[in-house]
């Protein structure tokens, strides 16, 4: 809660700094810059006695003219001393701001202070009232609800660029606290957009969502706007979401409502627009995060696929058996079995029926260790069953 201070001059409303300063200069002087005539001395010819040559503040070039202009302890060409906006030559007075010169008309149009209430210009000699960064005329420094002029020592609140006295601010606070969050934040249809919270004298039939919850709480008054009133409010909202006091008074006169109802409708409409913008921003951020996550996953999968190179197919090598590597003589019918001691351990001879695999040979794959099925079957067919061969050898032994 701020307390209004006394009126002050406009010159004391704005701080002065090295980068943001405004100064009216009345003393534009024209000085005679005489040219040296007559025979030059030896010092001038050698450069030791060369006179100091002025430099123009505007174009930063040396001034070789006979006459020059002096402004604020700086030198200017006559053609460079002109307004930065209208390019009009400055002869008697000028305004200096941010190292630029302006005429009086352009300076007031660009940098003159404006009243935050009526948006009109404030004269430099006029007393003003200031609230934070806002400057008001003495007559415009009043409450936007009761239109009571605020004076020195009055407590007020600056809310969304609008001035409220202490009593109206407390009434609005109590009124807004009685509204449920769902009603104030939810986005309604066009018919429900016209429902605003009026003053005490404008009570209409309407039921709130929380009227039955607390019997001690009074029923919340509502105002149902017509289609024409709603269109007028929306058209004004498209032009400016924060209309000034004159615009609100005009809308109230056109629609037949109070200024307070108009102000509350604009407050609710601004809250709805902020919520819609916030929801849209959240949806965009969620979509962007999902899209980014999908791109990251696809990039990871591509990296995993490229990091593993396919293995070369194993070269299958089949060990073929040579028919001449083993003999079939021991398996012939009617042969005498071995009679020497120890021969019964090798009844079929010392020749191995399988090739001896060289120890230096490297096996490139697991398939090198196995024989082809067709080769094994053919070998078994040629060799025969060893048990049958034993029976035949036994019968031939006892028969002899």
Curated annotation (Swiss-Prot):
Localisation: Nucleus
UniProt cross-references to InterPro entries, sorted A to Z: HD (IPR001356), Homeobox_CS (IPR017970), Homeodomain-like_sf (IPR009057), LIM_Homeobox_TF (IPR050453), Znf_LIM (IPR001781)
Domain LIM zinc-binding: 56-106, 115-168
GO biological process terms, semicolon-separated: mesonephric tubule development; neuron differentiation; regulation of transcription by RNA polymerase II
DNA-binding region, residue range(s): 218-277
UniProt entry tagged with the keyword Nucleus: yes
Region span, Disordered: 176-226
Any single Pfam family the record assigns to this protein: LIM
Annotated keywords: Activator, Developmental protein, DNA-binding, Homeobox, LIM domain, Metal-binding, Nucleus, Repeat, Transcription, Transcription regulation, Zinc
Stretches of the chain forming a coiled coil according to its record: none
Disulphide-bridged cysteine pairs: none
GO CC terms in record: nucleus
Gene Ontology MF annotations: DNA-binding transcription factor activity, RNA polymerase II-specific; metal ion binding; RNA polymerase II transcription regulatory region sequence-specific DNA binding
Keyword Methyltransferase: no
Function description: Specifies dorsal cell fate during limb development.
Protein name per UniProt: LIM/homeobox protein LMX-1.2
Lineage: Eukaryota, Metazoa, Chordata, Craniata, Vertebrata
């Amino acid at each position: 809660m701020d307390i209004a201070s006394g009126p002050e001059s406009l010159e004391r409303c704005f701080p002065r700094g090295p980068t943001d300063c405004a100064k009216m200069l009345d003393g534009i002087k024209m000085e005679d810059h005489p040219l040296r005539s007559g025979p030059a001395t030896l010092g001038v010819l050698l450069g030791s006695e060369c006179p100091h040559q002025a430099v123009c503040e505007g174009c930063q070039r040396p001034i070789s003219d006979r006459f020059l202009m002096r402004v604020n302890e700086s030198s200017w060409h006559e053609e460079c001393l002109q307004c930065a906006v209208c390019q009009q030559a400055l002869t008697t007075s000028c305004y200096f701001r941010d190292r630029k010169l302006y005429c009086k008309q352009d300076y007031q149009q660009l940098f003159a202070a404006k009243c935050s209430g009526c948006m009109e210009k404030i004269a430099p000699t006029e007393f003003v009232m200031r609230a934070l960064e806002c400057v008001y005329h003495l007559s415009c420094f009043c409450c936007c609800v009761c239109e009571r002029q605020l004076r020195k020592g009055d407590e007020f609140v600056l809310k969304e660029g609008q001035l409220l006295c202490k009593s109206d601010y407390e009434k609005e606070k109590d009124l807004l606290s009685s509204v449920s969050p769902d009603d104030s934040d939810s986005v309604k249809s066009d018919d429900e957009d016209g429902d605003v919270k009026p003053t005490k004298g404008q009570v209409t039939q309407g039921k709130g969502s929380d009227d039955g919850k607390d019997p001690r709480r009074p029923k919340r008054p509502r105002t149902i706007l017509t289609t024409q009133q709603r269109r007028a409010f929306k058209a004004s909202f498209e032009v400016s979401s924060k209309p000034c006091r004159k615009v609100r008074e005009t809308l109230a006169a056109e629609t037949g409502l109070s200024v307070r109802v108009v102000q509350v409708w604009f407050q609710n409409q601004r809250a709805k627009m902020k919520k819609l913008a916030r929801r849209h921003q959240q949806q965009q951020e969620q979509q962007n995060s999902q899209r980014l996550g999908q791109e990251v996953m696809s990039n990871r999968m591509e990296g995993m696929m490229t990091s593993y190179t396919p293995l070369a197919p194993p070269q299958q090598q089949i060990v073929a058996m040579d028919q001449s590597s083993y003999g079939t003589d021991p398996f012939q019918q009617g042969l005498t079995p071995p009679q020497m001691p120890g021969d019964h351990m090798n009844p079929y001879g010392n020749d191995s029926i399988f090739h001896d695999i060289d120890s230096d040979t490297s096996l490139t794959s697991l398939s090198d260790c196995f024989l082809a099925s067709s080769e094994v079957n053919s070998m078994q067919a040629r060799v025969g069953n060893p048990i049958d061969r034993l029976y035949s050898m036994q019968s031939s032994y006892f028969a002899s």
